[in-house]
Amino acid sequence: MYITCLDVEGVLVPEIWIAFAEASGIPELKKTTRDEPDYDKLMNWRLGILKEHGLGLKEIQETIAKIDPLPGAREFLDELRTFSQVILISDTFTQFATPLMEKLGWPTLFCNSLEVAEDGEITGFKMRVEQSKLSTVKALQSIGFDTIASGDSYNDLGMIQASKAGFLFRSTDKIKADYPQIPAYETYEELLGAIKDAIK
C-alpha cells in the first residue's frame, strides 16, 4: 500500500516568505529552508524581522490571498490522487496554508500552527512534532504504508531518504550536487512518471 508524501512550498505553491518579502519590500525575508537547514533558527529570525517592522499575521495573509498554485500543480495533484493516496507535509502553518489548500482542491495537509496575539502579532510557533516530515513518513511506514516522497529543500531530505522512493523536485543546484544519488526532476510530468514507476 503506497502513500505519496509531498512538500508544499516550492513544489505545489510559490514560497510564501519570498512572496511576502517582495510585497513588503524586506529582502531579508527571502531566506528559506533552501538556504537555512535549521527551521527553528529560520522561523525565530523571521519573527524577529516581523516584530522589528511591526508586521503581523494580517499582512502576511493579505499576500497569501494573492498567491496561486504553481502552473500545473492542481492538475498534477488531481492526477496523482487517481492512483495514490497523497498527504502534503509542510513546515508551514494552518493560518498560512488554508487559502492555498482551497485552490488545490482541499488535499490532506499535515503542518504546524502559529501563536498569534490578539493584535495580530505572531508571537511564536508550535511545531506538530520534531522533524515533522521524517517523523510522519516513519509513522506511516509503521502502520503498513510504503512511502514515496518528494520535495525541494534541505528539510525534505529526511523523508526522501527514508522512503521506498524519493525524488527532488525543482531543487537547488547545491542540493542536487550534494545528493547526486537522489533523482531530480523539473516538471510535473517527469515527477508523475517517476511516482507511477515506483508504484508498479
What residue ranges belong to the model's regions?
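Alpha-helical substrate-recognition element adjacent to the catalytic core
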Residues: 2-113, 117-118
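Alpha-helical segments flanking ligand/cofactor-binding loops in enzyme cores
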Residues: 78, 138, 157-158
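Acidic, Mg2+-coordinating phosphoryl-transfer loop and its flanking beta/alpha structural elements
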Residues: 86-91, 145-186
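An extended, acidic
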Residues: 94, 161-163, 196-200
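Short, well-ordered alpha-helical microsegments
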Residues: 94-98, 156-157, 192
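Substrate-recognition "cap/lid" segment bordering the active-site pocket of phosphatases
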Residues: 95-147
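Short, acidic/turn-prone active-site loops that include or flank metal/cofactor-
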Residues: 111-116, 171-175, 189-191
